[in-house]
Curated annotation (Swiss-Prot):
Disulfide bonds: none annotated. Belongs to the XseB family. Bidirectionally degrades single-stranded DNA into large acid-insoluble oligonucleotides, which are then degraded further into small acid-soluble oligonucleotides. It holds the Pfam family Exonuc_VII_S. It comes from the Bacteria. One of its GO terms (cellular component) is cytosol. This is Exodeoxyribonuclease 7 small subunit. It is found in: Cytoplasm.
């Protein structure tokens, strides 16, 4: 049994956009709409978590001498 590859941010966003389009059409049966909504919420959380992770990575930047220093937008 192969382990499922974790979805990338871009893949999750594409699926989320597809779900939103289906729900916006308005002709989705209630049960399907609920399932789409639940899947959309999972994808939304996945995207949020990935963005949070990247944000934490960007809090520090590497100086030329290799030292990690807190990132300050004013210095950029």
């Amino acid at each position: 049994m192969s382990e499922e590859k974790e979805m990338t941010f871009e893949e999750a966003m594409k699926q989320l956009e597809s779900i939103v389009e289906k729900l916006e059409e308005g002709n989705v049966p209630l049960e399907d709409a609920i399932a789409f909504f639940q899947e959309g919420m999972k994808l939304s959380k996945l995207c949020h978590d990935k963005l949070q992770h990247v944000e934490k990575q960007l809090e520090y930047m590497l100086r030329e001498d290799g030292e990690l220093v807190p990132f300050s937008p004013e210095e950029a």
